[in-house]
């Protein structure tokens, strides 16, 4: 499962946690690397190219949850 697929399982109209917030932001970003399973690629994208801001420390926590899923 890609990180994008993992995030899409957390989409919701009401943001209840960091994963939901990131999922909602990523869903609206057509350039997000949807096929990636690579931490560095996704982290770099969020840091340098994403059209939104998301705290990278929070991203790290969501990534750890992804790895445990």
Curated annotation (Swiss-Prot):
Pfam families attached to this UniProt entry: YozE_SAM_like
Domain of life per record: Bacteria
Entry-linked InterPro entries: UPF0346, YozE_SAM-like, YozE_SAM-like_sf
Signal peptide: none
Family the entry assigns: Belongs to the UPF0346 family.
Protein name (record): UPF0346 protein llmg_2280
